[in-house]
Amino acid sequence: MSSYFVNSLFTKFKGGDSLRSNYYDCPSYTPDLGGRPSVLYGHNTGSAFQHAAQFPDFYHHGTSSFPHASYQQTPCAVAYPGDATGNILGQDGLQKQSFFGAPDSDFTQFGDCNLKVSGIRDDLESAEPCTAQLFPWMRPQATGRRRGRQTYSRYQTLELEKEFLFNPYLTRKRRIEVSHALALTERQVKIWFQNRRMKWKKEHNKDKFPSSKAEQEEIERERQEGSQVSEKHTSGEEDSEASSNSK
């Protein structure tokens, strides 16, 4: 029974015609085993491809010798022989060589990139500058412009007077501490002490401000003695006037 099954298969599928290379839709150039012309089994089977003898004329004269009807009706691509593929690859190689061998100035496929870059540059140049907020202390001061007078509050004046009575000359470290404590600048504290020393010299009729605390205490003592003498003098005059009036 098995031999019957095998024989039926062999009689149904023959080895010569059924195993041809052009059985599928896309035929290759490999000549068929039977030596017969290729037969297409696609949807366009009206006309068959030409014999292999016409290939030399086709590749010798160019693409114009290719049959127009076969080109339109053949559904699949045609496989070319070895020499034909060599010619085609050679032409592609020449085209690639001429393409890559051209100078950079001849390339126009990247022109749009240059246009985009130039457009971005124009946009950046035409953009308005950023207007940042400027505070009064950030603006440059003119040379001929006169500064306004600084007004001190009662608390600031009281603290500065206390510091002046303790020490009329401030060190740099102490001046920084006072300026931070009173919310003033070092320059403002320095100017206030200079003006205060000038005022003291006018009040005491001195050409020079005492450089030490001892000198300042001595001056204060003399001032107190002078005030006491003047008071005694005025009181004596009043007593003499009162005695003369009683007489």
Curated annotation (Swiss-Prot):
Keywords: Developmental protein, DNA-binding, Homeobox, Nucleus, Transcription, Transcription regulation. The keyword Metal-binding does not apply. Residues 145-204 bind DNA. Residues 201-247 are annotated as: Disordered. Residues 204-236 have a biased composition (Basic and acidic residues). The keyword Transcription applies. One of its GO terms (cellular component) is nucleus. Pfam families: Homeodomain. One of its GO terms (biological process) is regulation of transcription by RNA polymerase II. Belongs to the Antp homeobox family. This is Homeobox protein Hox-B8b. It comes from Danio rerio. The lineage of its organism: Eukaryota, Metazoa, Chordata, Craniata, Vertebrata.
